[in-house]
């Protein structure tokens, strides 16, 4: 496995680049905007292809690299289902698995620092975001933080992992790089409490000043810019309501870009072909299945995904590949359901 812990000294943020091997798909956790060039350089050196960029939560102390990485690599951007961030193209829930070639991150909902905080378990290590820090815990006094929820996330979720599980947080300000669950149980001063009420009192009494970047970072991270807006401006989008008859039209092929777990949870549009977004480029290129289908039948390719972000990028890629009539369903499966479109489970 390729594993790199990368540090932004300005914000004290750790980002994590992960892949199963050289030449494979990669994902990155908690990227920082100012470090995007470095991430891309490192991935080029390691012959990696970024397919997913993940944030553990809405950050208040730096601007995320999710939007820039999406624009420069066409990767899938991932956050928890509670997140309101507009750049997110895939939303996950507790118990899901974020998969790339050869690896899978097990998704754990660990609210408390914020209401959209997640941790991700990969074999012998857990990426805890700002929920559990090295000899500390994330503050709970803004962004719908809740010390009671954080206590539950730490004591009833994270601390139940094996003692030798490596802990990789999103931040450290003392120079520490990694800990273990066992170390934090024994030595973390904020975990030396006898009850949830004692923990709540401890966290409520911290009286911390707001992060220096908070007034800039939070709004910037909420609005990274939708790929859908530009695609709609070019006339390459259809509304879900206008697409309601597409499943029965002989001149249209619907293409579902979501992953299998998303389809199982949220349902499928009848008759749609399943081409997961990471496999799209091969399918639309010369000799690819979708390119051949469009050439042989003359059908219009209509892409859709969960929210419309992946499908917007797919339309651009398809048109770049010569599929000049490709469009996507603006707003994805969510908009389709709101419009009353048929769904099969």
Which sequence ranges carry the predicted segments?
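Divalent metal-coordination and catalytic microenvironments
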Residues: 18, 30, 57, 69, ...
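Active-site neighborhood of phospho(di)ester-bond hydrolases with catalytic His/Asp-centered motifs
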Residues: 28-31, 49-59, 78-81, 110-112, ...
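Catalytic cysteine-centered active loop of the rhodanese-like fold, especially the PTP/DSP P-loop
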Residues: 108, 259, 275, 286-338, ...
């Amino acid at each position: 496995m390729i594993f790199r812990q990368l540090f932004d000294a300005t914000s004290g943020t750790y980002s994590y680049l992960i892949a199963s091997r050289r030449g494979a798909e990669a994902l990155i956790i908690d990227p920082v905007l100012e470090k995007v060039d470095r991430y891309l350089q490192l991935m080029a050196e390691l012959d990696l292809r970024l397919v997913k960029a993940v944030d553990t939560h809405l950050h208040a102390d730096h601007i995320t690299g999710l939007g820039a990485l999406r624009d420069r690599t066409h990767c899938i951007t991932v956050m928890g289902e509670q997140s309101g961030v507009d750049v997110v193209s895939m939303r996950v829930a507790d118990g899901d698995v974020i998969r790339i070639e050869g690896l899978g991150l097990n998704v754990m909902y660990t609210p408390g620092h914020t209401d959209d905080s997640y941790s991700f378990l990969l074999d012998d290590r857990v990426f805890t975001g700002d929920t559990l820090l090295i000899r500390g815990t994330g503050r709970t006094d803004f962004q719908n933080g809740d010390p009671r929820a954080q206590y539950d996330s730490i004591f009833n979720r994270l601390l139940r992992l094996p003692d030798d599980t490596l802990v990789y947080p999103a931040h450290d300000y003392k120079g520490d790089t990694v800990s273990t669950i066992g170390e934090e149980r024994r030595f973390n001063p904020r975990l030396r409490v006898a009850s949830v009420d004692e923990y709540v009192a401890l966290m409520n009494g911290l009286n911390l000043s707001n992060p220096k970047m908070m007034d800039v970072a939070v709004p910037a991270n909420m609005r990274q810019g939708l790929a859908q807006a530009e695609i709609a401006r070019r006339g390459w989008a259809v509304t879900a309501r206008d697409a309601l008859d597409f499943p029965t039209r002989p001149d249209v092929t619907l293409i579902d870009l979501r992953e299998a777990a998303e389809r199982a949870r949220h349902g499928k549009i009848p008759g749609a072909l399943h081409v997961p977004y990471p496999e799209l480029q091969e399918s639309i290129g010369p000799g690819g299945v979708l390119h051949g289908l469009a050439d042989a039948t003359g059908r219009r390719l209509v892409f859709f995904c969960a929210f419309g972000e992946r499908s917007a990028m797919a339309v651009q890629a398809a048109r770049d590949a010569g599929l000049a009539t490709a469009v996507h369903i603006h707003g994805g499966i969510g908009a389709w359901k709101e419009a009353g479109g048929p769904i099969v489970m």
